[in-house]
Amino acid sequence: MKKQISNLDKLTLSNDFLFKHVMLRKRICKHILEELFHTKIADITYLEAEQTLDVYPDSHGIRLDVRIADDTDTHYNLEMQVKNPVNRTGEFQLPKRTRYYQAMLDTDMLQKGQDYDELSPTYIIFFCLFDFFEDSQRIYTFKRRCLENMEIELADEAAIMFLNTLGTKGDVSPDIQSLFDYINSNTVTSKFTREVADTITEIKNDKKVRDSYMTYEMRMKDIREESLAEGEAKQKLRVAKLMLAKGCYSLQEIVELSGLSIDNIEKLKNDMHIEKQA
């Protein structure tokens, strides 16, 4: 019998679901951190007791970042970014997402009883298949500095790194460059990316992962449908408000054109009347 090919079989490392599962392989993840920071790391620990597919608080997506601590208690947050996301007003989301991740990392540490002056060093790391800053750097690293004197750094031990897989400027190790090439083209060019490719094959054949991916797909489908329904509901409300404001449509006409129930329209009419009087 011919084996049925699932969506999981088609995924490459640039997919955030698969990227997370590869990063959960300690040997690979530790090696990437060692190559990025040019240092030996004795061990890493995953900060989530159980690796789950967490939904963002605003239900706009599923969190697929990986949180790690090394033997020096430096904390890392890793995530794959294939697209440059924008919000509904057209504003790029990544810069403010870094604030969310930083708050999450710090809050987790403080909840464990640490005083703020004991907060661990943190690195928020995005693997990006696009050049967010359009300067062709392979790595963009951000730390807080004084605007009046850029030599003065605020020593809060928090850094944000954007790894640009398309970059051509700046030095990275051969294994990091081969990883970038593998992310971009799915082409093995080194012993390390051969290990990554073999690991991906193992992951795709793991029944638990396959079941997890089915759950992930269903949850993503639910989120998309909820977002669509939310958008449709807002559009219906907007149409009804405009028609009520015009004052020349009957309630039945508004029901037919907006798709809202007559009870909802009457409530909306009362709310608008109260707002007008306020």
Segments (PLM) and residue ranges:
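Accessory alpha/beta interaction modules
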Residues: M1-A159, K169, A278
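Short, charged alpha-helical interaction segments and adjacent helix-coil junctions
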Residues: K2-D9, L13, F17, A69-D71, ...
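Short amphipathic alpha-helical signal-transduction/dimerization elements
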Residues: Q102, D106, L129, G167, ...
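C-terminal segments that line or cap access tunnels to active or ligand-binding sites in enzymes
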Residues: E157-K169, S178-I183
